[in-house]
Swiss-Prot record:
Cell compartment(s), UniProt: Virion; Host nucleus, Host nucleoplasm; Host nucleus, Host nucleolus
HAMAP family recorded: ADV_PKG1
Organism of provenance: Human adenovirus C serotype 5
Region (Disordered) location: 1-78
Gene name linked to the record: IVa2
Transcription regulation recorded as keyword: yes
Induction (record text): Expressed in the intermediate phase of the viral replicative cycle.
Pfam families: Adeno_IVa2 (PF02456)
Stated family: Belongs to the adenoviridae packaging protein 1 family.
Stated name of the protein: Packaging protein 1
Function: Component of the packaging machinery which encapsidates the viral DNA into preformed capsids and transcriptional activator of the viral major late promoter (MLP). Binds, along with packaging proteins 2 and 3, to the specific packaging sequence on the left end of viral genomic DNA and displays ATPase activity thereby providing the power stroke of the packaging machinery. The activity of packaging protein IVa2 is stimulated by protein 33K which acts as a terminase. May be the protein that pumps DNA into the capsid powered by ATP hydrolysis.
InterPro entries, per the entry: Adeno_IVa2 (IPR003389), P-loop_NTPase (IPR027417)
Region described as DNA-binding: 440-449
Amino acid sequence: METRGRRPAALQHQQDQPQAHPGQRAARSAPLHRDPDYADEDPAPVERHDPGPSGRAPTTAVQRKPPQPAKRGDMLDRDAVEQVTELWDRLELLGQTLKSMPTADGLKPLKNFASLQELLSLGGERLLADLVRENMRVRDMLNEVAPLLRDDGSCSSLNYQLHPVIGVIYGPTGCGKSQLLRNLLSSQLISPTPETVFFIAPQVDMIPPSELKAWEMQICEGNYAPGPDGTIIPQSGTLRPRFVKMAYDDLILEHNYDVSDPRNIFAQAAARGPIAIIMDECMENLGGHKGVSKFFHAFPSKLHDKFPKCTGYTVLVVLHNMNPRRDMAGNIANLKIQSKMHLISPRMHPSQLNRFVNTYTKGLPLAISLLLKDIFRHHAQRSCYDWIIYNTTPQHEALQWCYLHPRDGLMPMYLNIQSHLYHVLEKIHRTLNDRDRWSRAYRARKTPK
């Protein structure tokens, strides 16, 4: 059936198009600008206003993002400059210290930049980025050891709950070995605080009364810590630690080796709490035929298994010579092997100190080993009763070598960080060497023959 005057129905979702003016060409739409970063070949149409029945192009178009200046790769931000400056101060101090040593002639001279400004100007993007990462590593190493230190930077403990504590004290006569032993206990550098201290000497009669009183006073002082409102807090399970003096011959009695024997004086004390055994002036006795090495390795574990209250076992032995010739039973050799700590007086003979440093610094650069020897030499010329401590099993690598000062306390020497900084100096030296080699090769090619 034919219908007249009806428009065909519009398709669904189809918008009405504006009718173009007769005799007028359809206006070309404005060009569409887009960011060259978008690689879409068929982008979606951009929504715009209806141009109206006149068919004119819209007056507004999508504007291009204004061009940004290219960022230079060799420009450092403020944080990077701060990192490089901080690292440069450390490198400059280490370099000047190494140059001022008496043994600096034996070291390989390292090339370096003349100043910080020269480093920032001529260092190059790659080297400066490496230095930023190296300084971040140094900061991480310092932050790792910070929880183990007090607010003033000193160590809060010598063993940090490591047990058993087997330590050897090396020092000549008059260097303050007895005072050092008392200070270790009175300043609570050995934790936990021992409740019974055994003082072993060749003969009991050779201990002066003044020294006995000093021992009793200082171990009692180390048993307490200051509390709030002027109070004191006991650091162990007793109000007054026991001080027991013994002769060396009583130490080596057979029943003192058996922890199940009721006559064992060490087992009786271990049943109450931690103990400490101090051997002073006993080097000649240790070099005899009677073996006492059980006190250094087997005895601590037996006491701890049988007496749970014995949470701490400390043995400190005094030696006047780092390499005694008389050691028939092997006690001194076994003691050095089992020892966890070596407390060394800088007044020891230089040949013995150099031998010890060469033995226990195999993993350090040669320059840092020479620096450690120079530290020993420097403190040997002073009158302070200071000590340098080597820890075989430190709580952190930075605490492996420490310096004990009567006023400053136990300070870490951070030889691991000094070794890291020396490797950075070597990296700068290699970079400058490579540049010099490339410059010589370039000039050789450009020079007419």
